[in-house]
Amino acid sequence: MSYVEEHGEANLIGAGPAMLADVVAGRRFREIAEPTADGSWTIRDEVLFPAVSDCFPHRLLLANSDRMRALSQPVPMPTWPDVHRLIVQLTTTGVEVDRSVGAVARLLAAMDREGLLEPVSEPAADLDHAHMTFLGHSTVVVRSATAAVIVDPWVRPACGHYPADYQPLQLRDLGRIDAVVLTHSHPDHFDTGTLLQLPCDTRIVVPKLERETFLSVRMYERLHELGFDDVTELEWWDSVQVKDIEVTALPFHGEQPTDGSQLHPDIRNAGNTYFVRTPRCSAAFLADSGRDAAGDVRQVAARARRDLGSPDYLFVGYRGWLMYPVQLLTSSVGRYLPFVPPESWGVRQRIMTTADEAVDIAEIWKAPHLVPYADGGAPWYWQIGLGPRLDEAASENPVFDPFPERVSVAAATRTKTGSGVHRSTVNVLLMRPGDSIVSGGPQPRIERMQNFAWPYGEATAAVADAAYLG
């Protein structure tokens, strides 16, 4: 980061290969990797496969809604299920707190002493009628008449820095949740602080992973440590039933160290994408997927259309993350860098799907409605550096954190002929955090909650210059 501050990111990219060569030649890198005869290296097994017994949840971090008071409390490993039950009780209205467990009583006393116990608000609205509710970033609730499944739950606390009538939705606002579906173990998709607010017997579906690695948390094991007792590992193309909702796991390609070959190709950011079908609609959730040496999300879309049919709604991450390997140093996935082979150091990588590719996928899958997501979308995200700003200070990095309107522009400018610019038949739905789809059919209706209205304008004007993306 100091190099970027002094010389600028453009110079970092140009100097990247030489800088990375110096790093690889250094003593500290040799502590994690062995050089090979071809000028590459092999990462040591103890790095590739961390000892799970040495890495366990040992501390609970708590803060009040405005982050002015905080508590860091040690939690002995055997007491996590008791602490989990306490958190559920504290975040649920009308539930009496059980103070009979010693560890729980001590934690409550510490929270009270630090002023961290606040009244729990009543649910914001009755959302049981909604087919789907978008909470922001990658979090979506899918409902049938009898069940509800939440994808990648990540809720943020209320805060005085946000508009008074536009605060983050909480789990208690969503009604009954029958199951959780997790795509991968990056912290903006696998948020234990949110998950601990759900009862211990909540069903959770996670990707199949035999062994925890440097790039992937084995969520099955970690969730059991926290007290969850109904966790299912689901392999690609397998399905589970949650009452009348069917959840099918699909391959997760992309968001790997490179979009081509990598060192230790078996060590991946392991994940699932999902096709979720209810009696009244269907949706697919592609999270941060894209393409890599093992496959391409567009191939997944083609097979899924044959095997499962077309989803009514396709939720696609569109961030692109077009970057050179040295830029990983300034990203949230710097740990990818040891897996990038030297011949790729000077080659730009496409880590995720771009806006234009999102429309490609929808056309291949024959999905009538495309929802851009997985890029923040509200102040509680962009204030921590996730996603573009969509308020009056609207700003974006088009190749890293673009406006969601970029997907609308991509759909409206698919090709150009002598008669003009031609659009896709795919309908792009721009959903804001708190929006719900409340009716099906060819023109679904988006409903915004009362007292939870989007307080900002639209960013379409900011991308009007992109009349044709090509």
Residue spans for each PLM region:
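Binuclear metal-ion centers of metallo-dependent hydrolases, dominated by the metallo-beta-lactamase
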Residues: 1-35, 224-243, 329-470
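Pre-active-site segment of Zn-dependent metallo-hydrolases
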Residues: 2-81, 110-127, 141-185, 192-197, ...
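Structural motif
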Residues: 147-149, 178-179, 203, 245, ...
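Short internal beta-strands
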Residues: 201-213, 315, 368-372
